[in-house]
Amino acid sequence: MTTREQWIAFITIVRKEIRRFLRIWMQTLLPPAITMSLYFIIFGALIGSRIGEMGGFTYMEFVVPGLIMMSVITNAYSNVVSSFFGAKFQRFVEEILVSPMSNNTVLWGYVLGGVARGLLVGLIVTLLSLFFTRLHIQHIGVTVGIVLMTSIMFSLAGFINAVYANNFDDVSIVPVFVLTPLTYLGGVFYSIDLLPEFWADVSRLNPMLYIVNAFRYGVLGVSDVNVGTAFLMVGVFTLLAYGYCMYLLNTGKRLRQ
Amino acid sequence: MSKALEIRGLRKVYDNGFEALKGIDLCVEEGDFFALLGPNGAGKSTTIGIICSLVKKTAGSVSVFGHSIDSELALAKKEIGIVPQEFNFSNFESVWDIVVNQAGYYGLTRELAEQRAETYLRQLDLWEKRNTASRMLSGGMKRRLMIARALVHEPRLLILDEPTAGVDIELRRSMWAFLKEINQRGTTIILTTHYLEEAESLCRNIAIIDSGEIAENTAMKTLLKQLHRETFVLDTKEPLPDTISIAGFETHKTDEQMLEVALEKGGSLNAVFAALSEQGVEVTSMRNKANRLEELFVSLLAKS
Ligand SMILES: Nc1ncnc2c1ncn2[C@@H]1O[C@H](COP(=O)(O)OP(=O)(O)OP(=O)(O)O)[C@@H](O)[C@H]1O
Ligand SMILES: [Mg+2]
């Protein structure tokens, strides 16, 4: 296929992916909006006022960046894993597998779908947060950069999950048992300075800590960790995930019999 | 003429160790209408799966219009349109979206995709249903949707895996007419079916596959010539005498007023009727016991 034909195929997948999550907005866009609004009300407004300051900011200001990032991560991941697994489950992934488009086209089509949902939900959550606090973005480049890279990384990870998933339980295992706990423990709700030395060190092994802090640095200008390290780490994980996705597609593992 | 499909020494061992294809050779000329027949589990869908790269081959080679699926897979894929045995489209998408998106996967511009989608949905009588979610179509409509989807990029080789399974007679005949027409316009067609009448009326060449091996691969006419025994069923006006027999013919009284007569190649039906008249039997109607290809099929499979 010519580059132009690959481009058309790519746009076809992206369009289809975006239309899919918009069509089922009650399952894709509404839940994070409700959950995050509840977080804002409970942690920010009700409990937050008693907690006082965290890292030099009101508690509300402190938690908002982490909650936005958490929404981006889970939605980018969930979109790709459920869409691609659905295609596998109903077998219409075969429409793509028999077509002449390249494996890169297929992969980036799905990844961009995940990124689109991650960013859209991130935007919705950001807008909702404005009812509770003000946001003055300190470093726009860092903010946008980390959101984009993170949503790409988790979309790729969602794709790997979809290839291996055998049933709908396998689709929700990672978001529920891995992503959410790691994000909660990754400094969304507290600064790791508050933790005893040992637990602070353990927290530094959690990749989510770097992502959440890099984003918080972009928005508030403060971070518990080095932001350069965060970008490097997300970059390395993204490359690894990309390499693994291409390995799966090129060998046809679990996709072609 | 060039070859639409050339298969050499194709073997498939599935992950569980089952050998579904034991080294088959198959050749389909451009413009042909080719039947791939065989009993359940013979390896037809496996062969088709390998051609369109949904199944990974264990050994052997496949090329489509000269493009090897090992070295020029994308070019080979462009030439193929596939109608699989099982439904494989999204239940939630509309007929229109399914066909238009498929065109997009082959790199057709949106404009061309919509134009083609309209052409084929109209030809396959699905135009009225274009905005319907695919899960709400009837079984026959779903088959036709898969045909429209397979044709939207105008492949030179169309492969249909049991396209008329569960399709009523009227619709089956209109599908036959449609397939004949696109074959006449130049599309090479390979078809699998369990309705042998379908293969006989549509296909010029035929391969019979059994337990992963090619049992027969020849022209339909040549094959039908091999048929050396045909069974006829006669209905009679009065109940048949118990002693009924026709010298030189194998007969079988299946009912009071029904007689089966096996006619060997070169045998004369006149002799049958003469013998029956002599015994005072009046025949009111006569038909073939089975489709001719069916008899051949059964005897071939019994041999192998
Ligand atoms: N994924 C698989 N793993 C293991 N064995 C398989 C797999 N798919 C098919 N088979 C086996 O391979 C053999 C050939 O199957 P195939 O589907 O090619 O038959 P077929 O000729 O299309 O039959 P039918 O007329 O019933 O559609 C069967 O014995 C089947 O059980
Ligand atoms: Mg089959």
Ranges and model annotations:
Chain B
Residues 154:
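Conserved catalytic motifs of ABC-family nucleotide-binding domains
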Residues 176-264:
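ABC transporter nucleotide-binding domain
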Residues 60-71, 75-76:
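Conserved ABC transporter NBD signature motif
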Residues 100, 104, 111-129:
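Conserved ABC ATPase "signature" region
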Residues 158-161:
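Catalytic Walker B motif of ABC-type/P-loop ATPase nucleotide-binding domains
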Residues 133-137:
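Conserved ABC ATPase signature
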